[in-house]
């Protein structure tokens, strides 16, 4: 999405049929990086439904199943006769081969997992500008044993004779690897070839057009009614606030609930930024003592989360009744939430069809049904990176657009064990030093998250010739693309030394700083 369309009635140029792959969402993101609008739909979508949608191309995702298994997920076989170009990825390729008369079996030799050099047999069409010998990411235990009539080999690897195949006259293509993952060095070239040259798509999924359409749709939906938004200061709710302000002006009211677990200076910054600098109506709700009193004596992290979430709902309900009435509730629901709620009925462990599980998403924590709000969700077809682009176009500063992720329960889950005012003040000061030093070093935007954690133990130290017995602070810095996996960040020794020295000298109650060098997996980014 560049700065030059939106959900609304826009039809997807590319439809991704999801067979339970962990990469289905990533395929959609990669297609959108070419400025072509894509949607993820269930593998069970019928050929008639696709005909009505009239996409210019269809991509079949990978998946955990085997196409020859009794309960394997199968697409409508009439899809092959729609005259729409199809690209099958991994399981999607095997399904195409199987349904059109070929044969797929369990690999008799080595299964392929990881990187493999691609040897190209036909460098035209799908593989134009894909370098011979380029690395592609493999993840399959089954292999094609016989191609259907009309198909030809485009490329192979050492262990996979048919790594890429095509039926040119019917515009049917398959690849045994995953071009969408970052490890596939020329994967985007292949995706662009399919999207632009084979499907004939135009790059019209742009930020400017999205904003114009979203503003029009919000105005049409809301009319002259009032809208309430729970503002957290994160990029999603901030972008939504700017978009709604542009669309409906003073009909928007934002509610900022300060539960006492935010970072140092954050509540003041957010109120100054939204209310005073940009004249967005923000109601500040100081609920600090109410929240912390509810956590008295609570040490279990899940119980802490539950208490904070429940109390948030109660405060939100009370204050919305006081400030209302409101007809609409604005939520920063994103496309990954929509995909997860829709659910693909594939068991990720067995690869078999199972009953669909529906999961609801509420950015304000699961609102009571009797609030009777109608929902406004203009961001529900955007991925996180697209939200950031929209935010920039609307005038959000980089300090919010590129703000590090921050958990909903805030510092309450970065204090292990019971949360007290003393611990909160200690952690706020330490966390501020971490962020200040990383910004000063020019590394803030190079790191996915950087923060401090306070442990519920004390250690012995010596300061000013006197014995100390104080808390340790854990420094947690990770690098990641999407938060699903992460590696610990290798910070310069000089930076680590400055952070440690400042914390033990400036933060009362701390005498030791330790570094967390655990990746995700096996660890998680947050400690609780």
UniProtKB/Swiss-Prot annotation:
InterPro entries noted in UniProt: Class_I_gatase-like (IPR029062), GATASE (IPR017926), GMP_synth_C (IPR001674), GMP_synth_GATase (IPR004739), GMP_synthase (IPR022955), GMPS_ATP_PPase_dom (IPR025777), NAD/GMP_synthase (IPR022310), Rossmann-like_a/b/a_fold (IPR014729)
Domain GMPS ATP-PPase: 205-403
Gene3D superfamilies (UniProt xref): 3.30.300.10, 3.40.50.880, HUPs (3.40.50.620)
Pathway connected to this protein: Purine metabolism; GMP biosynthesis; GMP from XMP (L-Gln route): step 1/1
Binding site for ATP: 232-238
Domain Glutamine amidotransferase type-1 span(s) in chain numbering: 13-204
Active site, UniProt feature: 90 (nucleophile), 178, 180
GO cellular component: cytosol
The entry's keywords: ATP-binding, Glutamine amidotransferase, GMP biosynthesis, Ligase, Nucleotide-binding, Purine biosynthesis
EC category name: ligase
Highest taxon above the source species: Bacteria
Catalytic activity: XMP + L-glutamine + ATP + H2O = GMP + L-glutamate + AMP + diphosphate + 2 H(+)
This enzyme's EC code(s): 6.3.5.2
Entries under CDD domains matching the protein: GATase1_GMP_Synthase (cd01742), GMP_synthase_C (cd01997)
Recorded GO MF terms: ATP binding; GMP synthase activity
Known function: Catalyzes the synthesis of GMP from XMP.
NCBIfam families linked: guaA_Cterm, guaA_Nterm, PRK00074.1
Subunit organization: Homodimer.
Full protein name: GMP synthase [glutamine-hydrolyzing]
Protein species of origin: Prochlorococcus marinus (strain MIT 9303)
């Amino acid at each position: 999405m560049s700065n030059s369309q939106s959900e609304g009635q826009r039809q997807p140029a590319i439809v991704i049929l999801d067979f339970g792959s962990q990469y289905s969402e990533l395929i959609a993101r990669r297609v959108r990086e070419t400025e072509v609008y894509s949607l993820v739909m269930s593998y069970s979508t019928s050929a008639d439904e696709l005909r009505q949608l009239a996409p210019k191309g269809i991509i079949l995702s990978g998946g955990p199943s085997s196409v020859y298994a009794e309960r394997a997920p199968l697409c409508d076989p009439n899809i092959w006769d729609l005259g729409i170009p199809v690209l099958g990825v991994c399981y999607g390729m095997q399904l195409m081969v199987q349904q059109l008369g070929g044969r797929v079996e369990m690999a008799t030799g080595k299964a392929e997992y990881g990187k493999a050099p691609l040897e190209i047999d036909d460098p035209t069409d799908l593989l134009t500008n894909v370098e011979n010998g380029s690395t592609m990411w493999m993840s399959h235990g089954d292999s094609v044993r016989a191609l259907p009539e009309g198909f030809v080999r485009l490329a192979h690897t050492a262990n996979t004779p048919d790594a890429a195949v095509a039926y040119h006259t019917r515009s049917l293509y398959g690849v045994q690897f995953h071009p969408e993952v970052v490890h596939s060095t020329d994967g985007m070239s292949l995706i662009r070839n399919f999207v632009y040259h084979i499907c004939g798509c135009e790059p019209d999924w742009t930020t400017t057009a999205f904003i114009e359409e979203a503003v029009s749709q919000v105005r049409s939906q809301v009319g002259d009614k009032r809208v309430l938004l729970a503002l957290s200061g994160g990029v999603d709710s901030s972008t939504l606030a700017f978009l709604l302000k542009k669309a409906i002006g003073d009909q928007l009211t934002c509610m900022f609930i300060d539960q006492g677990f935010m970072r140092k200076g954050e509540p003041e910054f957010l109120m100054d930024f939204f209310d005073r600098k940009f004249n967005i109506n923000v109601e500040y709700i100081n609920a600090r003592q109410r929240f912390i009193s509810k956590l008295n004596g609570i040490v279990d992290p899940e119980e802490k989360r539950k208490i904070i979430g429940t109390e948030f709902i109660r405060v939100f309900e009370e204050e919305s009744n006081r400030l209302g009435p409101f007809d609409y509730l604005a939520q920063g629901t994103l496309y990954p939430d929509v995909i997860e709620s829709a659910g693909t009925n594939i068991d990720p462990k067995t690869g078999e069809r199972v009953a669909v599980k529906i999961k609801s998403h509420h950015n304000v924590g699961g609102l009571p049904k009797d609030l009777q709000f109608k929902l406004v969700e203009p961001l529900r077809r955007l991925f996180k990176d697209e939200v950031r682009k929209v935010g920039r176009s609307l005038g959000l500063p980089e300090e919010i657009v590129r703000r590090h992720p921050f958990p909903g329960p805030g510092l309450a889950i970065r204090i292990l064990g019971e949360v007290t005012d003393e611990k909160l003040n200690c952690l706020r000061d330490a966390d501020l030093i971490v962020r200040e030093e990383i910004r000063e070093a020019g590394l803030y935007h190079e790191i996915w998250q950087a923060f401090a954690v306070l442990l519920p133990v004390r250690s012995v130290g010596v300061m000013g010739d006197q014995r100390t017995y104080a808390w340790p602070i854990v420094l947690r810095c990770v690098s990641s693309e999407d938060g699903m996996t992460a590696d610990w960040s290798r910070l310069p020794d000089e930076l680590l030394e400055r952070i440690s020295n400042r914390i033990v000298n400036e933060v009362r109650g701390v005498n030791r700083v330790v570094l967390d060098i655990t990746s995700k997996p096996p660890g998680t980014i947050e400690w609780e």
